[in-house]
């Protein structure tokens, strides 16, 4: 594809790499570091620290962004970044964003943050898009650090401090290296859907010039508008 990069040709990974790129449309990318972050106690401080250190851009996409103490800490950090001149863009799913009222959208707009709803729910004209929801949870900072996993933004992921039996235990990952370029590419796919543009991701020079790592990763997008057999096709291709 046009987004391909130079991969480890001549190695045992090359045939598997070609199968994966053919099925997913995403190339194999090197990753300098992968850090596992369990629950909000470990995830949120890391995310906010990266937001506070951002110098150029922050792209955040989440299914749920709760209007609570955790949500406020993110809003305040994102506002401080924007005040420094950082390009801050936020996507929240139109249905997931309504899961825990009061919704945070008005607060984001009032604070002047560049926030979009993914397929917002409207009654007139009726637009529900029940199955066309965005469950992706991605944050990219300066094209250098990328986050993804199962955690939304909200107090319910603070397991140690929560007395709620429905608190959500989950995992997230912080990655650095060339794989972060693909996170930005995925974000702009959703951003362009929200705003009706064809803007492309900004590939970070710091990633382009970086020495290849021994750790190789690939982004695989999933959703109701994606090929639901993509993972199955990938496994069949690998083992055939």
What are these regions (language model features)?
Residues 1-237:
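N-terminal localization/anchoring segments of enzymes in phospholipid and broader phosphate metabolism
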């Amino acid at each position: 594809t046009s987004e391909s990069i130079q991969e480890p040709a001549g190695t045992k990974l090359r045939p598997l790499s070609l199968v994966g790129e053919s099925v997913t449309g995403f190339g194999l990318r090197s990753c300098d570091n992968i850090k596992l972050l369990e629950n909000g106690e470990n995830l949120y401080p890391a995310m906010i620290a990266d937001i506070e250190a951002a110098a150029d851009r922050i792209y955040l996409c989440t299914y749920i962004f709760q209007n609570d103490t955790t949500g406020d800490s993110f809003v305040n950090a994102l506002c401080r970044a924007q005040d420094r001149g950082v390009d801050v863009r936020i996507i929240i799913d139109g249905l997931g964003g309504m899961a825990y009222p009061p919704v945070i959208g008005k607060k984001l707009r009032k604070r002047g943050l560049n926030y979009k709803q993914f397929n917002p729910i409207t009654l007139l004209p009726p637009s529900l898009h029940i199955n066309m929801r965005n469950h992706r949870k991605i944050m990219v900072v300066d094209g250098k650090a990328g986050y993804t996993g199962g955690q939304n933004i909200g107090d319910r992921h603070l397991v140690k401090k929560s007395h709620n039996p429905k608190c959500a235990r989950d995992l997230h990952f912080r990655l650095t290296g060339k794989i972060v370029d693909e996170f930005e590419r995925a974000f702009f796919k959703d951003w362009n859907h929200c705003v009706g543009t064809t803007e492309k991701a900004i590939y970070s020079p710091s990633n382009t010039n970086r020495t290849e790592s021994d750790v190789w990763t690939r982004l695989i997008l999933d959703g109701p508008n994606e090929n639901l057999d993509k993972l199955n096709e990938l496994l069949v291709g690998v083992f055939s």
